[in-house]
Amino acid sequence: MLTLHQSPKLRLHRRAGWGIALAAAVLAVPVLSTPALAAAPGDPATSSSFNLKPGPDLSSAVTALKTALPTEGVQDLLDQGNRIAKTDASCTTDPFGTGDNGAVLAPARKLCWDAGDAGTEEWIPQGITGVSDAQADELWGSRKPLVTAWYDKANPALCTADSGTCPDKGVRLSFLDPETPVTGTPDGRRYRHALLVEPYFNSYGNASYRAIDIHAGGIAWYKYYLYVADTLNGLRVFDMRSILDLNPDQNASVDDTTLNGLKSNVTDESKIGRQSNIYYSHTYRYVLPQVASYKFVAAQGNSSAATCVATGAPKASYISIDRSAPTAPTLIMGEYCNSDTDHPEKGRVGALPIDDTTGLLQETGGTVTTTSAYYLPRDLTQGAARYNGMYYFNRSYLDNSGSLRRATITNGRLVDYGSNITNAVGPEDLYIEHGQSMPGATQYLWSLTEHRADTTAGCTDTGSPCGRVLYAHRLSDILARP
């Protein structure tokens, strides 16, 4: 059986300097031939291509890890934030500029990462979600966290004999509450990283875990469960009640004694999992183990990191939650495609039902059945969200201004609504802060940018400068555009 952790990796490096990497990677999965003619953009797609089945049950390994390592909650991570993002006037990074393709839509809100995260070549930000996805009242306890995902680029050029960047650390999350200022620093917002891991039992029968080598181009949070896009396979699922703490005494220089009498170490950057009776985490205090997965039922139709085909399973490039109908939540999933002459497909977007009682995907007879699917009107889509029937799409153009597009279902087809909205350079996943918990509350469309600021010619253009930020547009501002 092909399980998620056995599958070949697929990462989509889309920066001009990196190229459209892996564009011809041959994958060890069944591949369907590319049709001679492209599907018509906006037409209904075969919805069953998005159907999913549950993967292996990892709960026993997670339970065993929780008997060895203490758990913490999301609010604890926020309280233990050891990095500070800046907002308002203190956030000076500007990936919007004046815009290459017309008047840029300036964000209503913007947060800048700390200097290390803003400039790192190792970690690339991709996915975003938040408590407005997770909870109808838009609160986690008393907090309003955002969560973002970064993948480890694992660039061999960064790897030296004494460098901790040699191992591929997989995917990390950042937990940040944009509404809670740092005491004494009104423009500061604390945040904390946590490493995603896959649990397993080692050859001695002991519970351990390993890094998860995926792109994590989209994440979505519903109730306790965090969904992470696994490009060629489907979805990985994590439980926010299972965040493990490897340094509860907050003294990194001394190994902690674990609940089962062993040790945990947060100083060795090269190691992960249980090794010689010590638990490691590539120096991260917190790790979040995978609890479940969903795998595409259809054979994977894609054999390229960049291009797409019209049939077979899609790529899970990005995901989001549609909470328009409070009792019928939906997970939106779509593809990134860089069309060319031989591969003209623009990509597909589908909708999968969520069981509002459990927070997991809704199954019938062991299958998650897609409720709708369409071919995308345009390619180069990095993120998609849907609310009250309106689709929102982030599109990227290397180190040029990105664009925000809208679309609706009209006469049975997914068609453009209004004109292009010039956006930030390198826009990624999308998340809607729906504001349903308070009548008249401002609704926001959140996203983040992936390209770090550097001195290359394309990144210093005043029309489209590079830089990493979290940002939000008011939905009302977007809908007011022609």
Question: Model-found features: residue ranges?
Answer:
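Structural motif
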Residues: 155-177, 234-242, 330, 339-355, ...
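Short loop/turn segments immediately following beta-strands, especially the blade-tip
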Residues: 176-186, 239-277, 325, 339-365, ...
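Structural signature of eukaryotic scaffold interfaces centered on beta-propeller domains
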Residues: 119-143, 211-222, 308-330, 377, ...
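Blade-loop segments of beta-propeller domains
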Residues: 113-138, 148-217
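Loop/turn-rich, solvent-exposed surfaces of beta-rich toroidal or solenoidal domains
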Residues: 144, 320-323, 327-438
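Sequence/structural signature of beta-propeller modules
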Residues: 2-4, 17-118, 463-482
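Residue-level signature of beta-propeller blades and closely related beta-rich strand-turn architectures
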Residues: 134, 151-152, 232, 241, ...
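Surface-exposed loop and turn segments in beta-propeller and other repeat-based domains
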Residues: 69-121, 180-210, 251-312, 361-377, ...
